[in-house]
Design a protein with these regions (language model features):
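A short glycine-rich, Lys/Arg-flanked "PGG" loop and its adjoining helix->strand segment in the class I
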Residues: 81-100
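Short beta-strand element of Class I
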Residues: 8, 15-18
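A short SAM/SAH-binding and catalytic strip from SAM-dependent methyltransferases
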Residues: 50, 55-82
Length: 163
């Protein structure tokens, strides 16, 4: 957990970054790496993103990266997916004008879900609706993004043949 966040923090030492993770061993591992590398511009939160965004100030975010949220592939579980109209409304409220959301998943059907939900929300402008498969470059991207490191979940999805 957190390799992309760690790389981003190193690339942008003047940014204050906030990571959201529920997996406690992943948090511990990332905290250890941050301390070893003396990176001080990252804070971590161990509660669901929906609860965090409900508490953030309006217009307080300039960029949000959501990489490999649980795709909940079974239809009866789709209501558990992070990218939902209510969450997007919270996210929109927290973002300042011109802010960017970057998304990635290794599930093609979830990628389509993300694009459709972003496109339907009046507060977001879809920069690109291009969906690339895991074998494409950059891999598993949903919305146009800059260069980023491959995440553990992205590599796992590629090994398992997820599209």
């Amino acid at each position: 957990m957190g390799f992309e966040l760690l790389a981003w923090a190193q690339q942008q030492p003047d940014y204050q970054l906030l990571g959201v993770e529920l997996y406690q061993p992943g948090i511990g591992s990332l905290l250890s790496r941050l301390e070893n590398l003396q990176i001080t511009n990252v804070s971590l939160v161990d509660k669901p993103a929906q609860r965090l965004f409900a508490q953030l100030d309006e217009g307080s975010l300039s960029q949000v990266r959501i990489f490999f949220p649980d795709p909940w592939p079974k239809k009866r579980h789709h209501k558990r997916r992070l990218i939902q109209p209510d969450f997007l409304q919270q996210l929109h409220r927290c973002m300042h004008n011109g802010a960017i959301v970057r998304l990635a998943t290794d599930w093609a059907e979830y990628a389509q879900w993300m694009v459709e939900h972003i496109a339907e929300h009046i507060g977001f402008e879809l920069i690109s609706d291009e969906i690339r498969a895991a074998q494409d470059e950059p891999s598993a991207s949903v919305i146009a993004e800059d260069v980023r490191d491959v995440t553990k979940f992205e590599a796992r999805g590629e090994r398992l043949g997820h599209e």
